UniProtKB/Swiss-Prot annotation:
GO terms for molecular function: DNA binding. Residues 8-90 form the HTH TFE/IIEalpha-type domain. Pfam families: TFIIE_alpha. Keywords: DNA-binding, Transcription, Transcription regulation. SMART domains: TFIIE. HAMAP family: TFE_arch. PROSITE patterns: HTH_TFE_IIE. One of its GO terms (biological process) is transcription initiation at RNA polymerase II promoter. Transmembrane segments: none annotated. The keyword Nucleotidyltransferase does not apply. This is Transcription factor E.
Length: 176
């Protein structure tokens, strides 16, 4: 997929936004062809140099940008020339979705395996053991805690897991 096509994809735009934040998004959304300095980017985009550097470093940490250093022979100053490498984004998104799938499966099991109690007044949720420790009273307000039904939450998680598996074409057995 070409740079332009990648950057038009709303999922990829959101991914980049999550990485670099709103101040770094102009840097991530307009990668120049070839090498560019952070100063050139800041001037071209009308951004603070620190915001550009922060975005570039985040992109670098996520293998979406590389740099090479040049030392000015007269002044000894280093110049960093940055290159964007967005070819890895689809693979990284897939890895992120697998992490999400794993985390959601763990959370679903936690929700299934535990009994919960809720203080209607404070909105605090307790596991059975915690509720029992407190004598089934909320430690914040003293009200009685009530059994909390989480079937809808588990069902919503199962639906989301199914959607993720479909998107990933994962061959994972759905537990009943």
């Amino acid at each position: 997929m070409a740079f332009e096509e990648l950057l038009e994809d709303p999922v990829i735009q959101k991914y980049l936004h999550e990485l670099v934040g709103p101040k770094g998004m102009p840097v991530a959304a307009a990668p120049p062809d070839g090498e560019v300095t952070d100063e050139e980017l800041a001037e071209e985009l009308g951004l603070e140099l620190n915001d550009v550097r922060r975005a570039l470093f985040i992109l670098y940490e996520n293998d979406l940008a590389t740099y090479r250093r040049l030392r000015d022979e007269d002044s000894g100053w280093l110049t960093y020339l940055w290159t964007f490498q967005y070819e890895k984004i689809p693979e990284q998104l897939q890895e992120e979705m697998h992490r999400l799938l794993d985390g959601l499966e763990e959370r679903r099991e936690y929700e299934r395996e535990n009994e919960f109690y809720l203080c209607e007044h404070c909105g605090i949720r307790f596991e059975f053991g915690e509720a029992m420790e407190f004598g089934f009273e909320c430690p914040e307000c003293g009200n009685q805690v009530e059994t909390m039904e989480n079937t809808r939450l588990v069902t919503a998680m199962e639906n989301r897991l199914e959607e993720l598996r479909d998107e990933l074409n994962a061959d994972v057995d759905v537990e009943a």
